[in-house]
């Protein structure tokens, strides 16, 4: 049996295929798609190659998950083996159609020029603050990774902003995140960025995340709350830039959320203009969307004050699909609690707590609002809706106002495994032993089934 459109066999599991050798000509790319639960083992034998801008070390095996590509500027040879997961092996192909890489490195050089110019000016003059916009599957995150990786090669320390609440590049879904990139991106993690300190000791510098929780799957499910979450994330980011000259000159790379194609385009433009205002964006990169580019050019015409808007061709990448994204979210939650498949095993704990001691609030879609002043949170009165949910622990105390809860930072995540309605008890999977760090939690759309 095969998964539709992916050509993955689902009958073989946990088997190792023979080793394959790939020879890439200069400026060519090998694209791969590993089924969720599978692993690709790659060793660079000669030449140079990179995964989204991060160079592969020679003669060292890397364990890779998800979708991506290996690109070479000068030619290379590598070997790989694939270990099947529960949904099969992988698909792969080589292509010489790689104009996106030339575009990416030219864009990097332009941003680096802006950084050099900013360094010659007063410390409050910002380096490039780049917003990457485009439709789903246009390659926004791929381009962001390349720009971040190339910046670190120049000893820069840019801040990456992820505004897609469905993404699992930096942790479980539902949040918007900011993280300063101070080391190589870790291509062995699922998202390709790295792991946070919660995962234990790291081979590379751990990511120190700043997160605000949105909780719903679509930005348009509660546009008011999403814009609030982004604005609240911008406050500490701008404070960091104001007090850290190195970060100020290195700048920002902002990865914008996906907006469904059937949504009113005015919504997307309004969202992007809010992000521009919140973070002081001075460069907008539009990927493969003439209409969005035209709309933004009307907002920010050439010669006027405001960001520079540039359009680049669609970035080559593997298409996403709903089933794959769902599986990826489940895998990321599993790895958050249990560690990755290679060498980072974690020991989560099950704790039983009285539901009456918890302050769990459900995030309401905007369709439930009676007016603009309506509450966005609703206290969960019964525990029976909690099995298989993921609760987001907030840096707040019982009795906090809705504003205080929504403005607080994310401390971590818990998984409700079981509810005893008669005793009003809940069993919770926690990533670390000991007491819960907070009793104030938010319930969004994310579910997890072990």
UniProtKB/Swiss-Prot annotation:
Disulfide bond entries: none
Subunit structure comment from the entry: Component of a pre-mRNA cleavage factor complex. Interacts directly with PCF11.
A Pfam family that the UniProt record links to this protein: CLP1_N
Family affiliation: Belongs to the Clp1 family. Clp1 subfamily.
Keywords of the record: ATP-binding, mRNA processing, Nucleotide-binding, Nucleus
Gene: CLP1
Residues given in the record as ATP binding sites: 29, 67, 137-142
Protein name: mRNA cleavage and polyadenylation factor CLP1
Subcellular location: Nucleus
Signal peptide: none
GO biological process: mRNA 3'-end processing; tRNA splicing, via endonucleolytic cleavage and ligation
One Gene Ontology CC term in the entry: nucleus
Single GO MF annotation: ATP binding
Source organism: Yarrowia lipolytica (strain CLIB 122 / E 150)
């Amino acid at each position: 049996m095969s998964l539709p459109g992916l050509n993955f066999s689902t009958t073989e599991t946990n088997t190792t295929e023979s080793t394959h050798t790939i020879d890439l000509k200069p400026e060519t790319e090998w694209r791969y798609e590993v089924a969720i639960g599978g692993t690709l083992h790659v060793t660079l034998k000669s030449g140079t190659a990179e995964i989204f801008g991060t160079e592969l070390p020679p003669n060292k095996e890397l364990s890779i998950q998800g979708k991506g590509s290996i690109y070479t500027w000068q030619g290379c040879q590598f070997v790989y083996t694939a270990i099947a997961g529960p949904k099969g092996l992988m698909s792969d192909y080589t292509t010489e159609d790689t104009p996106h890489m030339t575009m990416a490195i030219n864009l990097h050089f332009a941003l680096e020029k802006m950084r050099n110019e900013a360094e010659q000016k007063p410390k409050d003059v910002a380096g490039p603050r780049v917003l990457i916009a485009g439709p789903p599957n246009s390659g926004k995150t791929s381009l962001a990774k390349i720009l971040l990786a190339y910046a670190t090669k120049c000893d820069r320390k840019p801040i990456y902003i992820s505004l897609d609440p469905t993404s699992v590049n930096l942790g479980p879904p539902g949040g918007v995140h900011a993280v300063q990139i101070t080391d190589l991106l870790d291509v062995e993690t699922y998202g390709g960025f790295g792991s946070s300190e919660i995962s234990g000791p790291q081979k590379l510098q751990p990511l120190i995340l700043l997160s605000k929780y949105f909780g719903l799957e679509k930005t348009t499910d509660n546009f008011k709350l999403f814009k609030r979450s982004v604005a609240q994330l911008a406050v500490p980011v701008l404070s960091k830039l104001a007090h850290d000259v190195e970060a100020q000159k290195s700048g920002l790379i902002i990865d914008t959320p996906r907006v469904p194609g059937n949504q009113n385009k005015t919504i997307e433009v309004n969202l992007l203009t809010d992000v521009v205002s919140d973070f002081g964006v001075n460069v907008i990169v539009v990927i493969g969307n003439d209409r969005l580019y035209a709309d933004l050019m009307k907002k920010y015409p050439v010669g006027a004050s405001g960001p520079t808007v540039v359009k680049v061709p669609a970035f080559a990448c593997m298409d996403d699909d709903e089933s794959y994204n769902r599986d990826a979210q489940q895998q990321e939650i599993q790895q958050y609690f249990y560690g990755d498949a290679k060498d980072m095993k974690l020991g989560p704990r099950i704790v039983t707590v009285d539901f009456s001691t918890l302050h769990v609030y459900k995030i309401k879609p905007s369709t439930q609002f009676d007016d603009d002043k309506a509450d966005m949170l609703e206290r969960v009165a019964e525990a029976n809706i909690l099995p298989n949910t993921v609760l987001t622990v907030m840096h707040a105390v019982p009795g906090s106002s809705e504003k205080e809860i929504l403005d607080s930072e994310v401390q971590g995540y818990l998984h409700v495994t079981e509810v005893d309605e008669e005793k009003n008890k809940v069993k919770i999977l926690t990533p670390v032993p000991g007491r819960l760090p907070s009793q104030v939690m938010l319930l969004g759309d994310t579910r997890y089934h072990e």
